[in-house]
């Protein structure tokens, strides 16, 4: 019976191995689909938001009262006219940034923060709008560290650039849309070298849920759609020194399991700033996978044992 037992054992091992390989193959395909969905959703949501902001800005650019106030550099009049506009588009369209900028890129008015003005703006989006004389847009970091999807338009009157109009949607709002649409959690970790700590802490002091600078050694988690970072991801961020490109892995903590998809996050200049980390809860699927594996092992063992007994008593 030893040759038969050996053959049965090999058969069981082969059957279980095929099951495991097939399960892992399906899992890899599922992760790849999720990763592709995240990247596609990010592009599509950004494109939709850009089109939305452009449509609103093109209406604002037609307002003769605003044009007159901008030409006169009348900050108070611009604020009076623009505050109701910002309140409306913030409530309806998630637009939180609204700027009037002079032709030399000096900030004339931040409608959302009217006491802060007079600084020179060197953001890439605005520089490109100035250089090309055309609208330009993209995700870009602000002076206080937040990332915003920005759109900048030259304000042209009688062939003359009298200033620039810029609007923006917080990056976190885009992440929230991805979370809601794909049923995932999203974390954005940015290398600390891209931040001014004093400005970061100034901005965080105003937040309902401030992000502590010392939470992790090398990165700050700028955006998070989950109130608590899972322990394995916190350990990952704690050990993170540099970005390593796109990758996927699985984590488990507190009887939960999640697919983890890491996508490099870059700015408009092509600088790799950090990582977009997406978590998809697969706790139920992982439990089904374990039950399936246990079932395959049990069935294979029972069938193999039954055949051995059959041939033994034959």
Predicted regions and their residues:
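Extreme N-terminal signal-anchor transmembrane helix of membrane signaling/transducer proteins, especially
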Residues: 1-25, 297-311
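Juxtamembrane extracytoplasmic/periplasmic/luminal helical "stalk" adjacent to the first N-terminal
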Residues: 7-77, 87-96, 149, 180, ...
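Short hydrophobic alpha-helical segments used for membrane anchoring or interfacial signaling
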Residues: 58-59, 98-104, 186-193
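Extracytoplasmic/periplasmic ligand-binding sensor regions of membrane-associated signaling proteins
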Residues: 87-169, 176-178, 247-254
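Short, glycine-anchored, charge-dense loop/turn motifs used at functional sites
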Residues: 102-109, 193-195, 268-271
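Conserved beta-strands of PAS-like sensory domains
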Residues: 146-180, 259-261, 266, 271-288
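Intrinsic low-complexity, intrinsically disordered coil/linker regions enriched in small/polar
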Residues: 173-254
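Membrane-interface helix-start motif
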Residues: 280-303
